[in-house]
Amino acid sequence: MRDSHLPDGWDVEGPVRAEVFMVWLNGERLELTGPDGAAPWILQLADSEHPVEAVDRIVSGLVGPPLLVHSTSWRRDRAAVILSFVAVIGPEQASGMASAPIPRAELARSDATRAPASIGHSQVLEHGLRHLAWLAQDDEVVAERLTGAWQDALAAYVPEPFRSLG
């Protein structure tokens, strides 16, 4: 995948996958859903695809346009780079797919210069929701999309500082 924002000589080669957490608000409770049930959805991205556009297109094809698609983190897993996304959908879009409440999880912690030894899906989603909570307060576009009950549901997700430097 060639990124036109990188200087010559810098390139991303090898498989890139999108890990999509489809999240919706069931009353006051955040839930995870998707075509494979309450689990992340793994998509192989083509070299020519922009990851955000690809996730938006694929989610739209499955359930209709999402309220929001945002990349929240990345990691290397075996031979691929995994880009994690939270795709926010409405309740009507979640109908017909298995869904489950999202439990809280401890964040995966790393050293100052190394990635965590292991990262679970629940930790990735926890990080993603904390990221979304921060954006809902700090980013005009996200704040316009995630109003009222979304703001209330995300209020408990507080970003934490990077502990390895303090």
Spans of features found by a protein language model:
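Nudix hydrolase/Nudix homology domain
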Residues: 33-43, 75-166
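Conserved Nudix-box catalytic region and its N-terminal flanking loop in Nudix hydrolases
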Residues: 7, 12-64, 78-80, 100-115
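A short coil-to-beta-strand element that immediately follows conserved catalytic motifs
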Residues: 62-73
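Actinobacteria-biased recognition of intrinsically disordered, low-complexity terminal regions
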Residues: 1-16, 21-26, 150-152, 159-166
